[in-house]
A protein has these predicted regions:
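Glycine-rich active-site/cofactor-binding loop and its immediate structural neighborhood
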Residues: 93
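Contiguous, often N-terminal, cationic amphipathic patches that form binding interfaces
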Residues: 1-81, 86, 98, 104-121
């Protein structure tokens, strides 16, 4: 009987990888987003390990009322940045609610750059 309780608890835990993939998927599927940006230390991690950080462009912390998420992005040239930021927040909240039923306190969006397409002449 104790084993069933332990298995149920284990099944209900959210892995960091699943959480980050859910957030990253919601962000990159948002219209106007070119890519996730880089947090300080992401390139350092990659340099030492040779692997990309799962946390690329995403910082997560616990707040008093729920989870606080900082998301760093590069947007496409010509988009209305406030709309893109709002849509990222909406998409991430929806994805996390749908997938994990989590209480989100804040989602902060930081625009790190604007991607432009080079025209060859």
């Amino acid at each position: 009987m104790g084993t069933n309780h332990d298995e149920k608890t284990k099944d209900n835990r959210i892995t960091e990888e699943a959480f980050l993939q859910c957030v990253a998927g919601a962000v990159t599927e948002t219209r106007g987003v070119y890519s996730l940006g880089e947090r300080m230390g992401d390139s350092l991690y990659q340099g030492f390990t040779g692997r990309r950080s799962l946390r690329k462009g995403i910082k997560v912390a616990r707040g008093g009322k729920g989870i606080i998420i900082d998301i760093f992005v590069v947007v496409e040239y010509g988009v209305h940045i406030p709309d893109v930021a709002f849509n990222i927040q909406t998409n991430v909240k929806h994805a996390l609610k749908e997938e994990f039923d989590l209480k989100i306190e804040t989602i902060n969006i930081q625009i790190q750059g604007v991607h432009t397409t080079r025209i060859k002449r």
